[in-house]
Amino acid sequence: MFLVKMVLGFLILLSPLCATGLDVSQTDIIERSLNFLLFAGILWYFLAKKLRSFLRSKSLEISKRLEEIQAQLKVSKENKKKLLKELEQAKEKAELIISDANKEAYTITQKYELQTKMDVENLIKNSKALMDLEVKKIKRELVESVFKDLRESKKVSFNVQDCVNILKQRL
């Protein structure tokens, strides 16, 4: 079949030469064409099986490599899916960790705010208590110094009951 196609193709290529009106008898184109066709046929006869086997082996080689590449591609796609799942899980875990950390930070902040508030209230109470003690101490010292001055001046006389009443009223 191939040989027939070659001969027809060759004749089609030679058809313009026949139409030109040249004298073909003085050229050896027909002999050369027949020699070429004979040479091509002999080459085809001897090399066809080897060429076919070579082309089949190359085709099988290419098919095997294609299958290997497709297998690698499939493995790569599976790995990609696996890694994407792991990435999603890692993102979810990170979000969970962040939300837990925010909750914990809020709880710790509230705890320290409450502790600080209680400490401030205790400091205020203690300072008020200290101020009250200091005020009482100063009043007592003032009253004592006034009584001492009054006793020493001897212009005013007090008995013990009057002193006790004055001290009770003032302190």
Swiss-Prot record:
One of its GO terms (cellular component) is plasma membrane. Its main location: membrane. The chain crosses the membrane at residues 2-22. It holds the Pfam family ATP-synt_B. CDD domains: ATP-synt_Fo_b. It is found in: Cell inner membrane. Keywords: ATP synthesis, Cell inner membrane, Cell membrane, CF(0), Hydrogen ion transport, Ion transport, Membrane, Transmembrane, Transmembrane helix, Transport. It is a single-pass membrane protein. InterPro entries: ATP_synth_B-like_membr_sf, ATP_synth_b/b'su_bac/chlpt. Gene3D superfamilies: F1F0 ATP synthase subunit B, membrane domain. It comes from the Bacteria. GO terms for molecular function: proton-transporting ATP synthase activity, rotational mechanism. NCBIfam families: PRK08475.1. F(1)F(0) ATP synthase produces ATP from ADP in the presence of a proton or sodium gradient. F-type ATPases consist of two structural domains, F(1) containing the extramembraneous catalytic core and F(0) containing the membrane proton channel, linked together by a central stalk and a peripheral stalk. During catalysis, ATP synthesis in the catalytic domain of F(1) is coupled via a rotary mechanism of the central stalk subunits to proton translocation. F-type ATPases have 2 components, F(1) - the catalytic core - and F(0) - the membrane proton channel. F(1) has five subunits: alpha(3), beta(3), gamma(1), delta(1), epsilon(1). F(0) has three main subunits: a(1), b(2) and c(10-14). The alpha and beta chains form an alternating ring which encloses part of the gamma chain. F(1) is attached to F(0) by a central stalk formed by the gamma and epsilon chains, while a peripheral stalk is formed by the delta and b chains. Belongs to the ATPase B chain family. This is ATP synthase subunit b. It comes from Helicobacter pylori (strain HPAG1).
